[in-house]
């Protein structure tokens, strides 16, 4: 789920408690949105004037605004941390290359070394920006959302509790498949980088012996192999997202069906049914956000 070596980077361990607190505040905003909106709709359904629902509508928008502020503040903090770590990693990597000398570059491949320093560090920066908050949100927010759902309607809580592990299992299985394809794709990318840079270095020699056109076909074949590996990894990633969306949509549909039938039979009031139904998609949102 998360690379444990990430915790060895400076500042990451200090960021985790902050992100955890922000996740709790985000849950409070989510729960407030659901309760305020359900209350306003219930009052309108009961025939009350819209002016009587204004405090609840304002409460809903206040929670919505709080949620956006939390997301903005978290993004800014993670952007700053990721930039600092990426800058440090790039400097450390360049220092290590200079210390080890040309032998290390030759073993790794000059093209691979160049792409690692340039694009590889950028990918690490994006990884830090995304993974820390997504992992904590997935671990904290769904579990907290279950608390009000069980208070509102325990049957909906059971449905959500039972479907969550199945989505996790499918994510793990498809994740392992995507990991294998991604590793093969990265190896092909390394080979392509080294192959292309070696070609640039020896282009004059290739022209001298009249082999430049033949060598261009070799580069094309390598790039096609890289394209196929990339598309294969993307197909598995898309399948993972589709499977997760299917489980999430199916779970919310089951909750909505049960709530609708019980509303018709008079076994549940409108307010708890609406609040539970609004919270159901929010329960799966951190998981879907992590999978994307």
Predicted regions mapped to residue ranges:
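Transmembrane helix-loop-helix hairpins at lipid-water interfaces of multipass membrane proteins
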Residues: 13-70, 150-155, 267-270
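Hydrophobic/aromatic residues in alpha-helical transmembrane segments
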Residues: 33-37, 58, 74, 78, ...
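Cytoplasmic coupling helices
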Residues: 76-95, 136, 160-204, 211, ...
């Amino acid at each position: 789920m998360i690379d444990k070596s990430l915790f060895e980077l400076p500042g990451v361990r200090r960021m985790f408690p902050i992100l955890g607190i922000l996740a709790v505040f985000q849950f409070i905003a989510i729960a407030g949105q659901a309760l305020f909106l359900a209350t306003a709709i219930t009052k309108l359904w009961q025939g009350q004037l819209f002016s009587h629902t204004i405090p609840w509508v304002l409460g809903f928008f206040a929670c919505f605004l709080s949620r956006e502020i939390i997301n903005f503040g978290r993004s800014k903090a993670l952007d700053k941390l990721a930039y600092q770590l990426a800058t440090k990693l790039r400097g450390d990597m360049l220092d290590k290359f200079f210390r080890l000398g040309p032998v290390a570059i030759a073993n790794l491949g000059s093209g691979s070394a160049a792409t690692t320093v340039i694009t590889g560090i950028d990918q690490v920066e994006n990884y830090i920006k995304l993974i820390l908050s997504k992992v904590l949100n997935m671990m904290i927010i769904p579990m907290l959302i279950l608390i009000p759902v069980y208070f509102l309607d325990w049957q909906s809580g059971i449905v959500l509790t039972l479907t969550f592990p199945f989505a996790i299992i499918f994510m793990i299985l498809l994740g392992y498949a995507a990991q294998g394809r991604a590793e093969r794709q990265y190896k092909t990318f390394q080979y392509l980088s080294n192959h292309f840079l070696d070609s640039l270095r020896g282009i004059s020699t290739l022209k001298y012996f009249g082999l430049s056109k033949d060598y261009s076909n070799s580069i094309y074949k390598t790039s096609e192999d890289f394209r196929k590996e990339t598309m294969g990894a993307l197909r598995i990633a898309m399948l993972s997202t589709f499977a997760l969306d299917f489980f999430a949509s199916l779970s919310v549909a089951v909750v909505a069906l049960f709530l609708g039938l019980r509303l018709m039979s008079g076994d549940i009031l409108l307010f708890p049914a609406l609040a539970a139904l609004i919270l159901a998609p929010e329960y799966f949102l951190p998981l879907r956000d992590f999978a994307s």
